[in-house]
């Protein structure tokens, strides 16, 4: 209902077109502004909720001049949010609109989130790719054969100067796959992945594919690549609006903009030895594997990716039916960021004995978790995986609970200044009980928790007074985007303008 959409910030309406560039050949867009009338929720005029939208979001736009107008009975225009602020929203349209009459200037408009079916389609394609893969690759993924390793590197691995060098050498020694468990703050992307890339890049002609689940994580990979010296050439596959401005020059559309012939496109892609993108964006471009063979694919955030989402890439075929990816490295932490699915454990449990025998016990598990679980059962499989144990993010008192509950006490502090601070009277880990939502309410929002978060934010602001820095003093992490809107609403009610600038986001975005 409209009331529910307003409550969770899933709709913005009563918008007018300020500038219409829908007919532009390149980057057609619309600039929308509030109509000047206060946006109301059906449930309660006083319960204004801030919209739950951000740059890059896929949206649908439609005329909405009455409460009965919605996406099912009006013409829909698809696009993405270019930028938005409290005064205006810029929508980048997916298709140009030469007929100006379809977007009348005197009409009111609404935007809602778009539901994409490409993810489901790519998973079916991934399953087909798996069934069409070579027997050797299928046997590997189903644990029917042991992964192979270059034992000649054992001495170097044993004598490695530090954790990241050891892990990079183990990744190099792997002929099939390698798993890296990276608990929070251990540098799995900024240090471990970077070291792996440096190691593989030294091999003449080695082609590297870097993947992650979210665009924000791909930004972090690009940041790590940009810090490598001497500089390395890389191309990012993805859309402009989902890419940090610092790395847009590396986007494939910009890298190929000067190419006049198909041969030039092929040459540019073949010349670049590192390609980066989300699993979804690479899955959507299977032709890449016909253009070049990747010696290694490194997947960050691998524990967030379900098996069908990743199989299409790991089982992709290149020219002459050869495997598109030589070997793969999975980096993640199933204790910290498991895959997010709607079904509960009972609904996704696997009962087939043959599947259980190869480790497929629950469809909620990622490929990383299944392979890691299988490797742990073999005492001689130490070459298959490793774990980073030195973390530089949390104070030991903050890390204590997670360390004991999930990591068997193996996490050690690096010893950075903030980890050595005396806590004094500070309680670094507190639990606040909240009230559950009424039966039938969304599981992704909780009003009680939003009020608690706002109250604590006000306390932090008052304690820091003039020293409060919205960009550094306080951040609020919440599991779901729908809850972000509720927390922002409660903070807005406080009337403290500085708190409106703090970062409130999901676990994945902070990670």
Please identify what each model-predicted range represents.
Residues 52-54, 58-62, 80-82, 90-92, ...:
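Beta-strand cores of modular interaction/reader domains in eukaryotic scaffold and signaling proteins
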């Amino acid at each position: 209902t409209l009331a529910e959409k307003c409550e969770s910030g899933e709709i913005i309406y009563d918008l007018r077109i300020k500038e219409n560039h829908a007919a532009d050949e390149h980057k057609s867009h619309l600039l929308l502004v509030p109509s000047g009338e206060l946006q109301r929720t059906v449930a309660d005029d006083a319960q204004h909720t801030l919209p739950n939208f951000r740059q890059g979001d896929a949206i649908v736009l439609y005329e909405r001049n009455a409460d009965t107008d919605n996406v099912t009975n009006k013409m829909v225009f698809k696009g993405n949010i270019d930028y938005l602020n409290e005064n205006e929203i810029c929508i980048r349209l997916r298709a140009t609109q030469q007929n100006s009459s379809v977007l009348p200037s005197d009409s009111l408009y609404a935007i809602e989130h778009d539901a994409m079916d490409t993810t489901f389609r790519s998973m079916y394609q991934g399953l087909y790719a798996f069934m069409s893969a070579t027997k050797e690759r299928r046997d590997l993924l189903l644990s029917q054969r042991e992964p192979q390793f270059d034992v000649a590197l054992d001495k170097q691995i044993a004598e490695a100067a530090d954790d990241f060098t050891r892990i990079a050498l183990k990744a190099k020694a792997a002929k099939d796959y390698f798993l890296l468990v990276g608990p929070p703050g251990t540098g799995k992307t900024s240090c471990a992945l970077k070291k792996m890339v440096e190691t593989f890049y030294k091999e003449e002609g080695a082609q590297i594919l870097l993947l992650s689940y979210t665009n924000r994580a791909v930004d972090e990979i690009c940041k790590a690549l940009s810090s490598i010296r001497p500089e390395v050439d890389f191309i990012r596959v993805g859309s402009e609006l989902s890419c940090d401005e610092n790395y847009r020059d590396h986007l494939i559309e910009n890298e190929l903009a000067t190419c006049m012939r198909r041969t030039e496109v092929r040459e540019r892609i073949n010349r670049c030895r590192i390609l980066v993108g989300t699993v979804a964006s690479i899955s959507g471009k299977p032709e890449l594997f016909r253009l070049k063979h990747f010696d290694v694919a490194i997947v960050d955030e691998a524990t967030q990716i379900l098996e069908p989402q990743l199989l299409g890439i790991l089982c992709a075929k290149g020219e002459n039916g050869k495997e598109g990816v030589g070997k793969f490295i999975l980096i993640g932490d199933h204790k910290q960021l498991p895959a997010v699915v709607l079904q509960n454990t009972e609904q996704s449990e696997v009962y087939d004995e043959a599947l259980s025998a190869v480790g497929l016990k629950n469809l909620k598990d990622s490929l990383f978790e299944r392979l890691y679980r299988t490797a742990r059962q073999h005492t001689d499989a130490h070459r298959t995986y490793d774990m980073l144990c030195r973390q530089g993010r949390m104070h030991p008192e903050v890390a204590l609970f997670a360390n004991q509950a999930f990591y068997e006490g193996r996490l050690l502090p690096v010893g950075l200044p903030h980890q050595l601070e005396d806590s004094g009277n500070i309680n670094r880990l507190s639990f606040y009980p909240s009230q559950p939502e009424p039966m039938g309410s969304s599981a992704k929002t909780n009003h009680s928790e939003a009020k608690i978060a706002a109250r604590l934010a006000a306390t932090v602001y008052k304690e820091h007074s003039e020293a409060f820095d919205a960009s550094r003093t306080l951040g609020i992490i919440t599991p779901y985007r729908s809850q972000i809107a509720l927390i922002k609403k409660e903070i807005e009610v406080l009337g403290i303008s500085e708190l409106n600038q703090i970062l409130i986001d999901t676990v994945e975005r902070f990670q």
